[in-house]
Amino acid sequence: MSYRVRFTRQAEKDIKRLSPKLRDKLKAIVRNRLAVEPYSGKALLGSLKGYYSVRLSFQDRIVYSIHDNELLVLVLRARTHYGG
């Protein structure tokens, strides 16, 4: 069972700002991890409870939500959480 992966406008903007190397890494993570095992990411806490995160680089993260009823992963952000 494979999930579809969609991106918010903000995530698309974030991806455009990534280096080509990180964009390639993001594609691999989406294809091999989020679409297949979306719950393998870290469950977030606090105001982001209900969302998940996967490390893209030392400072960059992919933040997403999972919609089981639609077999959908919605990527919200793909950028740093350190002031960027």
Language-model features and meaning:
Residues 2-13, 17, 21-24, 54-61, ...:
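Enriched for short, Lys/Arg-rich terminal
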Residues 23-33:
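Compact soluble domain cores
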Residues 29, 43, 69-71:
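N-terminal functional modules and adjacent low-complexity/disordered segments of proteins
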Residues 31-56:
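A short, surface-exposed loop/turn module that caps and links secondary-structure elements
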